[in-house]
Design a protein with these regions (language model features):
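Conserved catalytic-core motifs of GNAT/GCN5-like acyltransferases
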Residues: 6-7, 32, 76-77, 89-108
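Short phosphate-binding/catalytic loops that engage adenosine nucleotides
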Residues: 53, 70, 93
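Acetyl-CoA-dependent GNAT
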Residues: 1-39, 47, 99, 110-112
């Protein structure tokens, strides 16, 4: 079972541990917070890679951010990081820009009314 646990020192310090069966499996740091949009970085422990950890953890992050009234996630991924590009596409992200250094993708969490 995958879960995320807030480890920030305050409600605005958006850092999370990723736990798999109560064992540390990685971390997520939310940055570039510009409501209603945010960006994040995710790192999965080497021994936990290719086991679906990020695929299970990111929707949990998105639910947490929706509770905080965020509506859009934006990520920048190195073009050679094909695993992350595939993961984010599978989660519904759309490519919005690309240059030699990064592919920028975004996901709308809540449709504006």
């Amino acid at each position: 079972m995958i879960e995320i646990r807030h480890i920030g020192k305050s409600a605005d310090d958006l850092r999370f541990f990723i736990l798999s069966d109560r064992q540390h499996a990685g971390g997520i740091t939310v940055h570039s917070v510009n409501p209603p949009q945010f960006s994040y970085g995710i790192a999965v422990a080497r021994e936990m890679r290719c086991k679906g950890v990020a695929k299970a953890a990111l929707p949990l992050l998105f639910e947490e951010m929706k509770r905080r009234s965020f509506t859009k996630a934006v990520v920048q991924i190195a073009p050679e990081n094909t695993a992350s590009l595939k993961l984010h596409a599978a989660l519904g992200f759309e490519r919005i820009a690309q240059d030699a250094h990064a592919v920028t993708m975004q996901l709308t969490l809540v449709r504006p009314s």
